[in-house]
Amino acid sequence: MVHFTAEEKSTILSVWGKVNVEEAGGEALGRLLVVYPWTQRFFDNFGNLSSPSAIMGNPKVKAHGKKVLTSFGEAVKNMDNLKGAFAKLSELHCDKLHVDPENFKLLGNAMVIILATHFGKEFTPDVQAAWQKLVSGVATALAHKYH
């Protein structure tokens, strides 16, 4: 279980309140699919994923990215119980979708990069550390069903 200090929680909540979920979600998922092309196999029904520009402009990537980041809001609300908050998603990704749990870490890292680009100098090393801790905790929670 991940333990967050009051300061880390405050930092995460402060940034999350300013996140454009639709924009950042599409960018994070798009970046995952471009940087780690083998992840595209989980999205074969998304249509054209043939190039970085096709991926980043794909409406299905944007829509699913928004869905992913919206569910990530549950992590922000449930920092003290990530495993419980993601139990159903863990089961779905393990039992039905058969997603390699390493991909959760990759998506989390892509999300941190997107937050850094969106918030610039405001995304200090302390802010990044809090967010890395959260995305790592979410990745672990999503991988829970695999163990």
From Swiss-Prot:
Organism in which the protein naturally occurs: Propithecus verreauxi
Functional note: The epsilon chain is a beta-type chain of early mammalian embryonic hemoglobin.
Quaternary structure annotation from Swiss-Prot or TrEMBL: Heterotetramer of two alpha chains and two epsilon chains in early embryonic hemoglobin Gower-2; two zeta chains and two epsilon chains in early embryonic hemoglobin Gower-1.
Record PTM Phosphoserine, positions in chain: S14, S51
UniProt-annotated binding residues for heme b: H64, H93
SUPFAM superfamilies cross-referenced by the UniProt entry: Globin-like
Gene that produces this protein: HBE1
A GO CC term assigned to this protein in UniProt: blood microparticle
Molecular function as annotated in GO: haptoglobin binding; heme binding; hemoglobin alpha binding; metal ion binding; organic acid binding; oxygen binding; oxygen carrier activity; peroxidase activity
Tissue expression as described in the entry: Red blood cells.
CDD domains assigned: Hb-beta-like (cd08925)
Name of this chain's protein: Hemoglobin subunit epsilon
Family: Belongs to the globin family.
Short name of one Pfam family: Globin
Entry keyword set: Heme, Iron, Metal-binding, Oxygen transport, Phosphoprotein, Transport
